[in-house]
Amino acid sequence: MHRYRSHTCAALRKSDVGETVRLSGWVHRVRDHGGVLFIDLRDHYGITQVVADPDSPAFKVAETVRGEWVIRIDGLVKARSEDTINKGMATGEIELYAQEIEVLGVAKELPLPVFGEPEYPEDVRLKYRFLDLRRETLHRNIVKRTQIISSMRKGMGDLGFAEYTTPILTASSPEGARDFLVPSRIHEGQFFALPQAPQQYKQLLMVAGFDRYFQIAPCFRDEDPRADRLPGEFYQLDVEMSFVTQEDVWTTMEPMMTAVFEQFAEGKPVTKQWPRIPYDESIRKYGSDKPDLRNPIVMEAVTEHFDGSGFKVFANMIASNPKVQVWAIPAKTGGSRAFCDRMNAWAQSQGQPGLGYIFWKEEEGKVAGSGPLAKNIGEERTEALRQQLGLEAGDACFFVAGDPAKFYKFAGEARTRAADELNLIDRDRFEMCWIVDFPFFEYNEEEKKIDFAHNPFSMPQGGMEALEGQDPLSIKAFQYDAVCNGFEIASGSIRNQSPELMVKAFEKVGLSQSDVEERFGGLYRAFQYGAPPHGGCAFGIDRVVMLLVGAKNLREITLFPMNQQAQDLLMNAPSPATPTQLRELALRVVPSKKD
């Protein structure tokens, strides 16, 4: 028999009754029932109930063991009586009668419980992550993460993609966040950067003639954490293809990712045909470029119903500024003054003046609008609004007015709030879509200049003609995001593989040809030696896993995450370098000036 085990703690069944076996694992629980000890023995695979009665030679050792001790048990498999069968356990029809117990490792008093799922302070959980990872839900999440990544790898292989590994030590590049810098010992005063993404390398692979690339790529960005983004590092399914249009990228990746979701969705419906929604349409209908399509509320422009109306607040805004629009946020079943007042109070808590609203009820056999707005604009306009929005008695509608560029985010939040309050969102499904036709440029209010809206390596729609002849802010990019349930799960584009177009695009944001050659020299040179049309995308593995396991934040699907202050409490990182290390790198720590 093997030194430590003949079976795992999930393997034994009724067919094994009568066998002498050996198990090893952690003591999950110890219970004393009238002098008979019951030990739940746990390993990575499951739990087996072990019985040690006073007549057993293993009883003396069994009396000493405590929770989370590691032990080896030899014993006889017996069938449980009918009234003690546990149908909730894979091994619930049998129990192991202990004949010998060997203690392999003792455990100190635990700083956090492993049994059950109680809430516990995050700093304790992260400092003792090796214990936290023993908890059932977190352990299961990590296993599922591995399975999801394996499924992605298989799917990409089945599509004819090959996995290539790109460098971790590379040059700094403007991907939209701060770089993690690594000082060079050999080249004093010079630094590598950890890659924010393998963007340039995967494009260089296409120039080198590798047709279909993918990689489970670690990415590093020195940015502030939030629920759907961890500090430090994250992982993405990075993809690139040669000789493709954006439609080719969508039709390749969409079925593969749909299959991954269906495999792990536990029966929840998954969108099979992902709609393509232009960016401008997504902003207008949903107030977001990451719309949650489980929410049935679709916003509409209703400016004409308030133009010249008796509601002077909106009417005067429309008359004084051609950019002003009025958007409607219809809320079916929300037709009560109490609900409308709650929504208005919420808007004020968000720093807004409030939300105009109308709610409809049945009066004398017909549907009539109620509320201050309805009185101000009159019965005819109120009825026209109801007809346009398809509302009935018992429904409501909220209104936001101004420059959409300034209010669309709030309107989107109001749409979400209304749906949450009215319980309109079906949370047991995965709704996917592609957001397409992103702006190529945007105006940077802080720096008062034109900047790239997203990926600077995207191909502008219209090519050189658009760059030379159009208002930069009107140019669209061959760029797209994949969205699931309100989360961006992928971003990609068709790349700009022309050196002339590349220089012209960067000129628009204030960078010269020499700047381009200095910052993106490898890519710029490569494009001068026959670059194929190419494009791709990257799916955020962490967010995909978070959605599939139903976790509330990324720490629940990550092995060893940092805390909100970007610290690894388990490994005590970051930590000071030694004087010798600093000297070898020709570095000196200069304390920052405190205000």
Swiss-Prot record:
The protein's location, in the record's own words, is: Cytoplasm
Residues carrying the site annotation Important for tRNA non-discrimination: 33
Instruction: Check the record and name the InterPro entries matching this protein.
Output: Aa-tRNA-synt_II, aa-tRNA-synth_II, aa-tRNA-synth_II/BPL/LPL, Asp-tRNA-ligase_1, Asp-tRNA-ligase_1_N, Asp/Asn-tRNA-synth_IIb, AspRS_core, GAD-like_sf
Q: Which GO terms describe its cellular component?
A: cytoplasm
Major location, coarse class? cytoplasm
At which positions is L-aspartate bound? 175, 221, 454, 495
Binding-site list for ATP: 221-223, 488, 540-543
Please verify whether the record's keywords include Membrane: no
Specify the enzyme's EC class, one word: ligase
Q: Where is this region: Aspartate?
A: 199-202
Catalytic activity, as annotated = tRNA(Asx) + L-aspartate + ATP = L-aspartyl-tRNA(Asx) + AMP + diphosphate
Coiled-coil residues: none
Q: Which UniProt keywords apply?
A: Aminoacyl-tRNA synthetase, ATP-binding, Cytoplasm, Ligase, Nucleotide-binding, Protein biosynthesis
Please, one GO biological process term?
A: aspartyl-tRNA aminoacylation
Enzyme Commission number(s): 6.1.1.23
Entry annotated with the keyword Cytoplasm: yes
What is a GO molecular function of this protein? aspartate-tRNA(Asn) ligase activity
Assembly mode = Homodimer.
HAMAP family assigned to the protein according to its UniProt record, in alphabetical order: Asp_tRNA_synth_type1
Purpose: Aspartyl-tRNA synthetase with relaxed tRNA specificity since it is able to aspartylate not only its cognate tRNA(Asp) but also tRNA(Asn). Reaction proceeds in two steps: L-aspartate is first activated by ATP to form Asp-AMP and then transferred to the acceptor end of tRNA(Asp/Asn).
Annotated PANTHER family: ASPARTATE--TRNA LIGASE, MITOCHONDRIAL (PTHR22594:SF5), ASPARTYL/LYSYL-TRNA SYNTHETASE (PTHR22594)
Give the family from UniProt: Belongs to the class-II aminoacyl-tRNA synthetase family. Type 1 subfamily.
Q: What is this protein called?
A: Aspartate--tRNA(Asp/Asn) ligase
Q: Which organism is it from?
A: Agrobacterium fabrum (strain C58 / ATCC 33970) (Agrobacterium tumefaciens (strain C58))
